[in-house]
A protein has these predicted regions:
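N-terminal glycine-/serine-/threonine-rich phosphate-binding loop
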Residues: 1-34, 109
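Short, well-ordered amphipathic alpha-helices
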Residues: 20-21, 44-53, 85-88, 116-120
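Glycine-rich beta-strand-to-loop/alpha-helix junction loops that act as flexible
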Residues: 36-41, 137-141
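A glycine- and small-aliphatic-rich helix-loop capping segment at beta-alpha/alpha-beta transitions
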Residues: 48-58, 82, 86, 150-159
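Ligand-binding beta-strand-loop-alpha-helix segment within the catalytic cores
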Residues: 57-133
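Short gly/pro-enriched beta-turn/loop segments at secondary-structure junctions
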Residues: 128-134, 139-141, 185
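Class I SAM-dependent methyltransferase SAM-binding "motif I" and its flanking Rossmann-like core
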Residues: 137-180
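Single conserved hydrophobic/aromatic residue that forms the stacking wall/gate
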Residues: 183, 188-193
Length: 194
């Protein structure tokens, strides 16, 4: 995969938004399934998207999923869904039925299983695995992505789509898209701002 380097985080976010919108506009006869991460980079992207690119985005053809979620209610400031809802989803005309959140307030193992089944139903399946059109990944300062932290290599080769997991630094429970699925989704777009 060719890396793209931009001079600022704002320019990175704008380029990513325009890329996603172009993908959707280039194929007007289908729905796109995108899995989003949380964190500071997506927060900037969501804010810019709502304020600068609402009118050019075919919201009715976008299905929104999450790469991971902290096990907190959506009102909690740590919720990835809550952040996206406040910065983007509550502002743009995306149909409610196109938003598929991880219910972080539920039992993590049961919710990972429920969300895995939901993704299998809503996302196109190839070779018995769902394949997102785009998976947007962030990278934490400690090396984690999709709530998979260094030392949690068992989540690199599981057959499960989503797994209950935890942050080894503070014990916070999370639900994570496993690396098995990240590898088969095309394209996966890692985002790193430094």
């Amino acid at each position: 995969m060719k890396p793209y380097i931009f001079p600022s985080s704002i320019e990175t976010a704008r380029a990513l938004i325009l890329h996603l919108v172009k993908l959707m506009l280039d194929e007007p006869d289908r729905t796109f399934c995108i899995a989003f991460s949380g964190g500071s980079t997506p927060a900037l992207m969501f804010d810019l998207w709502a304020n600068e690119y609402t009118d050019i985005t075919p919201w009715e053809r976008l299905k929104v999923f999450w790469v991971d979620e902290r096990c907190v209610p959506p009102e909690n400031s740590d919720s990835n869904y809550g952040m996206m809802r406040s910065l983007l989803l509550s502002i743009v005309p995306i149909p409610y039925e196109n938003v598929f959140r991880i219910q972080g307030e539920k039992n993590p193992k049961k919710e990972a299983a429920r969300y895995s089944k939901l993704v299998m139903k809503e996302v196109p399946v190839e070779n018995e695995f769902p394949v997102f059109d785009v998976v947007l990944l962030g990278a934490g300062n400690d090396g984690h992505t999709s709530s998979i932290f260094p030392g949690q290599e068992e989540l690199l080769s599981t057959d499960h789509i989503y797994e209950a997991n935890f942050n080894p630094n503070n014990g916070q429970k999370r639900i994570a898209l496993t690396l098995s699925l990240i590898h088969i989704s095309e394209p996966t777009r890692p985002i790193s701002i430094s």
